[in-house]
Amino acid sequence: RSRGLGDVYKRQVPGIHNVSNALACIALCSEYGIQKHIIKSALLSFTGANRRFELVGSYENITIFDDYAHHPSEILATAKALKNKTYRQSWIIFQPHTYSRTKSLLDDFAKVLTNFDNIIVTDIYAARESNNYDISSIDLVNKIKSLGKDATYISSFDDIVKYVRERACPNDIILTVGAGTVTEIGRKILLK
């Protein structure tokens, strides 16, 4: 039914999950009799959901994206989407979301974060919680290191900006990832 829409996958929105979403959209629109050229135009103009592999900007040929991912499966989808990009090294600046989630999914977070070349973890975004779980971002960094991958804990956003600006190179991709205030870092990197 959706013949003639094969080139619609040449979109700006990366990731196999977005291909699945596009296919669902095509199927639903086709079922409702929407013309193929309208479906194609809509999909080609779709730039993605806010804070889902969202382009923040670039400087010195270094590109910064922001993603709301705050669960290991979402971070894995982001890592897989990154494979569709051409880059020298990947940077993830991750802010865990809630103490309870970080504690219960510590091993899963550590494993998925090893998909990135450079890993920076900042303080847990507490949201509505108090830390009654005996967990910190340092525990996550240590777990990542136990898997044989280097990771860096940096609390201050300004220190993260300085660290990344001193080390990122042309053709690198930087991702700020998490449901909290980590989204501020990408813009701060651009402003320095």
Task: Describe the predicted segments one by one.
Residues 10-118:
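Nucleotide phosphate-binding/pyrophosphate-handling subdomain across enzymes
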Residues 159-190:
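A glycine-rich beta-strand to alpha-helix segment
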Residues 1-9:
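Single conserved hydrophobic/aromatic residue that forms the stacking wall/gate
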Residues 110-170:
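C-terminal helical cap/extension that packs against the catalytic core
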Residues 96-99, 124-127, 179-182:
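Short glycine-rich anion-binding loops that position phosphate/pyrophosphate groups of nucleotides
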Residues 65-66, 128, 154, 177:
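Thr-Gly-centered strand-to-loop micro-motif
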Residues 84-85, 147, 167, 192:
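Alpha-helix C-cap/termination motif
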Residues 77, 104-106, 132-133, 165, ...:
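Short amphipathic alpha-helical segments
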